[in-house]
């Protein structure tokens, strides 16, 4: 019997944002009057799930037809690889940083548990392609520490400037050391305000946004446990600017983002018709944000890839 092959679904079978992207790929043109954005959730090494989804989109020839790619926190790094058309290099970076040089809880109290310096050293061995002609724009989200405002850094067109902006977006309060300087201002992790880049792309002119999730659609941060809350508040009280307030508000903010996306998935709520998310089914094993385990990262990449292929393709004999 002939083996089954995969083909892209008919756009009429897809949510509007995915349908618009598939139609562009079919036409080999962006001249449709739409402005299509991809938003990549971060979450430390949990971004492996979104990486797998992006690999599938690239494999299907879709990412080159986006107008802009946004990322938050570790999603900003993945966004750089996706925008440049080298998501496979991003996958290898995630595998290569699964070492104690990157995440080491034995450093608690002495130095940052997470070494962004080590991560960027690994990235420089496989640098993302920034600013290539014909590729989507790259934009990343970060929080300005002194006033707690979420800002878009970009479009980013130069390699070292892009890595500096990505470092700012990935500056995880408490875990990765102090907030970082970018173009004369101090920034921290964009995920404090917008973990899943959707609202900002829409505000900046996107007609549709495709959100790649690092966690399943039902995931919620909920209320922090008492012991965790006490420890985090103790450390956060020493942080500059608005960081303490933002850390305290983050669980509720994240959960509202997730609820809005869940509604959009069924075409309702404020994002209905304009936003579609790709997210693993509830119960899919997820990578913890500081879980530097190569096997878990590979499994999450494979799971994310399967999610995207399942959503966008059909098997035919």
Where would I find each of the regions flagged by the language model?
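Patatin-like phospholipase
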Residues: 1-70, 80-317
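Gly/Ala-rich beta-loop-alpha elbow adjacent to hydrolase catalytic centers
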Residues: 71, 75
């Amino acid at each position: 019997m002939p083996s089954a092959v995969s083909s892209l679904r008919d756009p009429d079978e897809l949510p509007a944002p995915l349908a618009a992207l598939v139609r562009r790929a079919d036409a080999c043109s962006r001249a449709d009057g739409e402005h299509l954005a991809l938003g990549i959730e971060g979450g430390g090494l949990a971004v492996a799930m979104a990486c797998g989804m992006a690999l599938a989109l690239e494999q299907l020839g879709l990412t080159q037809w986006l107008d802009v790619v946004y990322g938050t926190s570790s999603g900003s790094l993945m966004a750089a690889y996706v925008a440049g058309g080298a998501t496979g290099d991003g996958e290898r970076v995630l595998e290569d940083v699964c070492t104690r040089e990157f995440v080491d809880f034995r450093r608690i109290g002495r130095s940052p548990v997470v070494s962004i310096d080590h991560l960027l050293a690994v990235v420089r061995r496989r640098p993302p392609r920034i600013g290539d002609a014909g590729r989507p724009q790259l934009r990343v989200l970060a929080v300005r520490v002194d006033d707690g405002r979420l800002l878009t850094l970009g479009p980013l067109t130069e390699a070292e400037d892009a890595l500096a902006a990505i470092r700012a977006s990935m500056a995880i309060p408490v875990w990765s050391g102090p907030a970082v300087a970018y173009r004369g201002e101090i920034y921290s992790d964009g995920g404090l305000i917008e973990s899943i880049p959707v609202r900002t792309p829409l505000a900046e002119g996107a007609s549709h946004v495709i959100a790649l999730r690092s966690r399943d659609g039902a995931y919620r941060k909920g209320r922090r446990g008492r012991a965790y809350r006490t420890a985090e508040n103790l450390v956060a009280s020493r942080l500059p600017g608005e960081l303490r307030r933002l850390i305290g508000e983050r669980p509720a903010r994240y959960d509202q983002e997730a609820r809005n996306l869940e509604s959009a998935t069924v075409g309702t709520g404020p994002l209905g018709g304009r936003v579609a998310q790709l997210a693993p089914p509830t119960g899919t094993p997820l990578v913890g944000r500081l879980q530097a385990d190569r096997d878990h990262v590979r499994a999450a990449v494979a799971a994310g890839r399967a999610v995207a292929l399942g959503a966008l393709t059909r098997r035919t004999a």
